[in-house]
Amino acid sequence: MIELRHEVQGDLVTINVVEHPEDLDGFRDFIRAHQNCLAVDTETTGLDIYSADFRCRLVQFGTQTESWVLPIEDLEMLGREEVHEALDVLNKIVMQNASYDLQVLDRCFGIKMESLWPKILDTQILAKLVDPRPFGAGGFGHSLEELIAEFISKEQAENVKGLMAKLAKEHKTTKAKIWSTIDLYHPEYLTYAGMDTVFTARICSALAPLVPDVSRPLVPYEHKISEICSYIDRRGFLLDVEYSQQLADKWLGEQQVWEAVLLNEYGIEKVNATEDVAEAFEELGHKFTAFTDSGKRKVDKGFYADMIAAGGEKAHLAEMVQEAKKLGKWRTSWVQTFLDTRDSEDRCHTFVNPLQARTSRMSITGIPAQTLPASDWTVRRCFLADPGHVMASIDYQAQELRVLAALSGDRTMIQAFKDGADLHLMTARAAFGDHITKDDPERKYAKTVNFGRVYGGGANTVAEQTGISIETAKQVVDGFDKAYPGVTRYSRKLANEAKRNGYIINPMGRRLPVDRSRTYSALNYQIQSTSRDVTCKALIRLHEAGFTPYLRLPIHDEIVASLPAEKANWGAREIARLMAEEMGPVLIGTDPEVGKRSWGSLYGADY
């Protein structure tokens, strides 16, 4: 057996590494002695859990002063059995970002997450309940390295968590590759692994008492949300490989055509090199007046919009550059990535982070559902319902505005939703007069204001987004405040609370820090956070009703599902019913839609 020593916070920590089967007796004694609670972690070949060559190399168990490392790569079946038995007898398991490690154990050892989630205490969840702000935005951050720096020591964070970067440099490889290539028994690799559980145990002890009393009921709630999302991650979304490959090839061909034209006619070698593009526009006579902080000519979305508005050859060039850039981004960031990361069963896997933003809003990687073009079906067409299934989408009706009505108690807005009135038209008429109709542009301005107020936007934001004058924008904003005085009062109340305390508390008991210099953001944080909880509570109801195996994506105010074709209409209606919520006097209703085989069919695709 290998024994390593490391000092942390004045304590000498022992890292025990099993080398031979006979060393396992000591490991079993350790598990029996600490079966009430242990920190657990895994070391793997990378982050792509569902790729064909992914494997788990080490599994670690630890307390605040001692850890045991099992080299699974060497122990093979014996090691897997030991891990299974150890996890089975533990009453409580502490992990950092549990969803990842539980999916590793499920994928590599067949230890079902369903059996482990009830035992889990996730330090990342605790950290986000203590302070949801990322490092650099006033918070201490939520990665293990950031938490070590905050609660143990910056030196430990740099020296121990920096070991893998150091090893990558020494072995002349990348940090992404070192995980799979470093010798299994390299002492620094083993130190890194063994100390992870020690750090996690210590961080848990430091964080637990810091969770605000008002937020303590959220601990089991957030663990349940994380659990449900991990099952959605594990299930994956079926990829139409043939269609996706054809689309990737088509876009590559079109991209190469545009790039050839831009090179031959305008001398642009790289469309993503702004200096190349700027040079071409200067040759067409454009004089740059806007520059970046580093002094380079500013070429951004606003610049391209101005060039297109100017017309002529500059507009033609701007459109070609944008098309070439778009094709490159859509192909490499989306379609080719789907093809490259699909598993052996042609499924792509999401990685849902249910507590991402400071408001706890969800984020999704793997399948970037939140960033796909809103009305375009082309990329969504890559994904299919399971055989014999069709796609369904169930989304909330104006979720954030209805939450705003419920929380603010504004009588006019509440009544408007009860009556099914046109809220945007009401705002427009309050600003411009009763002669405004739903077809007038003023309604569009009012719509921007209605949603803008949720996000803390004022007249300047409205003017920027709609192109109207600042005077007209102020008129619409004043119209909103006149139409819904309860919202104005509620916004002022939250701003005062934020100024007084440095935070507000949402209806679920979540503490939301608000910068005292930006107290106008309090309303936005409250609405966004509460809306997120509406969706999350719906996920729990759907899970309890047995729908989780059919869910593919939770996207803010929408759930995407794969449903058996013969029961799809019933299933979509039932999901919609379970998602709907009565928030005080306001019904946050839902709209179910059933499509064809592909996700894109919900956006206009014919399959």
From Swiss-Prot:
InterPro entries: 3'-5'_exonuclease_dom, DNA-dir_DNA_pol_A_CS, DNA-dir_DNA_pol_A_palm_dom, DNA/RNA_pol_sf, DNA_polymerase_A, RNaseH-like_sf, RNaseH_sf. SMART domains: 35EXOc, POLAc. Residues 214-607 are annotated as: Polymerase. Disulfide bonds: none annotated. Its EC number is 2.7.7.7, 3.1.11.-. It comes from the Viruses. Coiled coil: none annotated. One of its GO terms (molecular function) is DNA binding. GO terms for biological process: DNA-templated DNA replication; double-strand break repair; viral DNA genome replication. Residues 1-213 form the 3'-5' exonuclease domain. Keywords: DNA replication, DNA-binding, DNA-directed DNA polymerase, Exonuclease, Hydrolase, Nuclease, Nucleotidyltransferase, Transferase, Viral DNA replication. It catalyses: DNA(n) + a 2'-deoxyribonucleoside 5'-triphosphate = DNA(n+1) + diphosphate. Belongs to the DNA polymerase type-A family. Replicates viral genomic DNA. This polymerase possesses two enzymatic activities: DNA synthesis (polymerase) and an exonucleolytic activity that degrades single-stranded DNA in the 3'-5' direction. This is DNA polymerase.
